[in-house]
Amino acid sequence: MAKVSGRSKKTIVDDEISDKTASASESASIALTSKRKRKSPPRNAPLQRSSPYRGVTRHRWTGRYEAHLWDKNSWNDTQTKKGRQVYLGAYDEEEAAARAYDLAALKYWGRDTLLNFPLPSYDEDVKEMEGQSKEEYIGSLRRKSSGFSRGVSKYRGVARHHHNGRWEARIGRVFATQEEAAIAYDIAAIEYRGLNAVTNFDVSRYLNPNAAADKADSDSKPIRSPSREPESSDDNKSPKSEEVIEPSTSPEVIPTRRSFPDDIQTYFGCQDSGKLATEEDVIFDCFNSYINPGFYNEFDYGP
């Protein structure tokens, strides 16, 4: 047998080592490739919608269907960019949320916009929305939604409080800015709680300046007493025709209360009757005195 030289043995060993190194590097590259494999869809891929209807999404926690509309012609609340999302309410049924979007889209963009359902099914609604502004109509849609009322009541503007289980009354409207809503709340708070109400702005800005000025002018004018006739009948004497009396102290000015507009937004919550009454307590105390105590028991033990 031919003897294998030492040089040949060394060549064979080197070939085996190179083969093992190549296989190891190949397996490492395969593992690295599988590790870097993208599991999420690419960014340019369309997002998966939670509802097939236009303008409808399902809330991941509550399970309700929310309707939204994108108003590209309006500015957002911070006035940093054009366009804002308009909330149309939360609904238990997906179809109801889709119809709410259709009605809002018809109010914003007219009959040529894309809808979820055929246009003829909204003929009566289109006639109803003609006499209302966008804000008023959107507010009416929200009030009809399932998320508007937290409790079950047959009365308009009445809902069960989610903390103490009692009933609360609401009346409101939609404002364009936070300042307008704050002023509306201040006016309602002063009307129902008096000048000691906690307001967002100073109370003096809500007093009628014209009435206060007229009252101040009337107080500053001297009070004239009727002329006294002289005791003697002598015509040559010039009797004192009038006497000027200056008031020592001006009477206290009672500020007038402003009338409460019907469309002002405010919130009136029913507090727990077991607590001591303070200046911020329930504004309907005068109304409670006329109610039979059994009226509240009927609701407290209800479903």
From Swiss-Prot:
SUPFAM superfamilies: DNA-binding domain
Residue ranges of the annotated DNA-binding region, renumbered to this chain: 52-118, 154-202
GO biological process: ethylene-activated signaling pathway
Top-level taxonomic group: Eukaryota
Basic residues bias spans: 1-10
Xref: InterPro entries: AP2/ERF_dom, AP2/ERF_dom_sf, DNA-bd_dom_sf
GO CC term, one of those recorded: nucleus
Chain residue ranges for the region called Disordered: 1-55, 212-259
Biased composition (Polar residues): 20-32
Keyword DNA-binding: yes
Molecular-function GO term, any one: DNA binding
Bias type Basic and acidic residues, positions: 214-243
Record's subcellular location: Nucleus
Keywords: Activator, DNA-binding, Ethylene signaling pathway, Nucleus, Repeat, Transcription, Transcription regulation
Keyword Repeat found: yes
Homology family: Belongs to the AP2/ERF transcription factor family. AP2 subfamily.
Function: Probably acts as a transcriptional activator. Binds to the GCC-box pathogenesis-related promoter element. May be involved in the regulation of gene expression by stress factors and by components of stress signal transduction pathways.
Annotated protein name in UniProt: AP2-like ethylene-responsive transcription factor At1g79700
Origin species: Arabidopsis thaliana
